[in-house]
């Protein structure tokens, strides 16, 4: 299956591993901070769903798109293949969606702490938390 779906699977996966390693090392070694400083992105991201369109995330989306685009362009030129869009770009999309779902989990966990603190305060101290405060916390999560 790999031979029919991916262009030259051996060199393809080796180059994908090396390219991903270079991209991760660049981002983690300061390239990510450099890019964020370049666009004057704030270090803090919102707790709400707005974090996914904050400048920090938009910079990472652009970085990922450029990395995938350059890798795909190389393979589209080096070894044109009938399934190249599905194999190269489809795999990149699967990886991105997996990362994004993990980030959704992180966002939900970041929201849990203040929300459940409010619930606990409402349960331990009657009439200290108004229904508006509760709805406001839910509204914060929804963006």
PLM feature segments, named:
Residues 42-48, 120-128:
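Internal transmembrane helix-loop-helix hairpins in multi-pass membrane proteins, together
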Residues 10-19, 52-77, 81-104, 124-143:
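Transmembrane-helix motif of ABC transporter permease domains
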Residues 25-34, 50, 59-62:
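Intrinsically disordered, low-complexity segments enriched in small/polar residues
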Residues 26-43, 104-119:
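Membrane-helix interface motif
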Residues 1-5, 32-47, 73-88:
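Cytoplasmic membrane-interface regions of multi-pass membrane proteins
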Residues 1-4, 8-30:
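N-terminal secretory/membrane targeting signals
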């Amino acid at each position: 299956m790999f031979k029919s779906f991916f262009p030259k699977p051996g060199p393809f996966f080796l180059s994908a591993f090396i390219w991903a390693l270079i991209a991760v090392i660049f981002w983690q070694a300061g390239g990510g901070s450099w890019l964020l400083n370049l666009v004057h992105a704030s270090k803090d991201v919102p707790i709400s769903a707005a974090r996914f369109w904050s400048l920090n995330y938009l910079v990472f989306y652009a970085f990922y798109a450029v990395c995938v685009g350059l890798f795909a362009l190389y393979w589209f030129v080096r070894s044109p293949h009938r399934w190249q869009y599905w194999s190269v770009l489809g795999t990149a999309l699967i990886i991105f969606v997996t990362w994004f779902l993990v980030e959704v989990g992180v966002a939900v966990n970041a929201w849990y702490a203040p929300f459940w603190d409010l619930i606990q305060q409402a349960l331990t101290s009657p009439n200290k938390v108004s229904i508006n405060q509760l709805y406001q916390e839910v509204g914060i999560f929804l963006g």
